[in-house]
């Protein structure tokens, strides 16, 4: 019985930790695959194809102001993050990914981005 009473708090802590990590959005697991498919073609490593001077594949660059002066990702502040504004806008001239890319994000993917930024974009 003593072993069970000692093991119970460890088991509960483990279950709570698992629930917390399932709700935590992770860049490499959740966001990078979406960005690789929809963002990095225009905002990745190749300076010849990079649009707007914005590089999203390097965190430090994504946190800086771009050519427009807007900051792509403001950790903890999705409403101030240009990426979030562009994902959710109804303006066809501003929406990202743009029409020419022939890429789209689902509502669930957009919300995942919002949660990731709100959680600190780590």
What are the roles of these predicted feature ranges?
Residues 2-17:
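Bacterial N-terminal signal peptides
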Residues 16-122:
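Aromatic- and Gly/Pro-enriched helix-to-coil junctions and flexible linker segments
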């Amino acid at each position: 019985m003593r072993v069970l009473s000692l093991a119970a708090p460890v088991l509960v802590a483990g279950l709570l930790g698992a629930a917390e990590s399932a709700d935590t959005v992770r860049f490499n697991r959740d966001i990078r695959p979406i960005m690789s498919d929809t963002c990095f073609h225009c905002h990745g490593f190749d300076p010849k194809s990079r649009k707007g001077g914005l590089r999203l594949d390097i965190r430090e660059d994504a946190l800086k102001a771009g050519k427009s002066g807007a900051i792509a990702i403001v950790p903890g502040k999705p409403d101030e993050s240009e990426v979030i504004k562009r994902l959710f806008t109804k303006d066809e001239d501003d929406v990202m990914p743009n029409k020419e890319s022939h890429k789209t994000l689902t509502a669930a993917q957009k919300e995942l981005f919002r949660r990731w930024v709100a959680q600190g974009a780590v």
